[in-house]
């Protein structure tokens, strides 16, 4: 499983998005490994402006598996946030929650967002991130 973060979806959906990121997302989709979580879905819907983007989102909802955010995910997110803060690293809470979701489900996280690199620098590679 590869949890695709909003940052990578944005590159994938834009004609001028980073070609390497677009290729990684495309490969995950073609292999059937791509998934998302409720936070990513919300962020994408929040940015969907026109009819075309909304149509794409409805299609994504139909075909892309969603990783649940459970009570365990929330506890893990709180621990990741605590570890980051203790190390002097401040990252958005939504990114911490997405990282926790990937870790809980054993999914690799596909992203184009430096904040996930900061989280990894604190917590290491114990589980995919």
Language model feature labels by segment:
Residues 64-112:
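Active-site neighborhoods of divalent-metal-dependent phosphate/nucleic-acid chemistry enzymes
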Residues 5, 37, 90-92, 113-114, ...:
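Histidine- and aromatic-rich ligand-binding microenvironments
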Residues 5-6, 44, 77, 102:
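Generic structural signal for small/hydrophobic residues in well-ordered secondary structure
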Residues 22, 37, 41, 54-57, ...:
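A general structural signal for well-ordered alpha-helical segments in protein cores
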Residues 1-36, 46-59:
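Short, well-structured N-terminal submotif of metal-dependent ribonuclease cores
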Residues 1, 99-129:
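Acidic, PIN/NYN-like endoribonuclease modules and their adjacent C-terminal/linker elements
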Residues 8, 40-43, 73, 115:
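Short, well-ordered alpha-helical scaffold segment located
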Residues 51-55, 84-85, 126-129:
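Short, hinge-like loop/turn segments at secondary-structure boundaries
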């Amino acid at each position: 499983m590869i949890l695709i973060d909003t940052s990578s979806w944005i590159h994938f959906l834009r004609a001028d998005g980073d070609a390497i990121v677009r290729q990684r997302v495309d490969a995950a989709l073609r292999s059937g490994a791509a998934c998302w979580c409720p936070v990513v879905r919300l962020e994408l819907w929040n940015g969907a402006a026109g009819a075309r983007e909304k149509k794409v989102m409805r299609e994504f909802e139909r075909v892309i598996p969603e990783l649940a955010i459970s009570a365990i995910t929330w506890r893990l997110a709180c621990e990741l946030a605590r570890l980051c803060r203790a190390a002097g690293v401040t990252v958005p809470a939504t990114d911490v929650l997405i990282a926790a979701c990937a870790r809980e489900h054993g999914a690799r996280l596909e992203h184009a967002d430096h904040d996930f690199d900061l989280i990894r620098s604190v917590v290491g590679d114990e589980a995919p991130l």
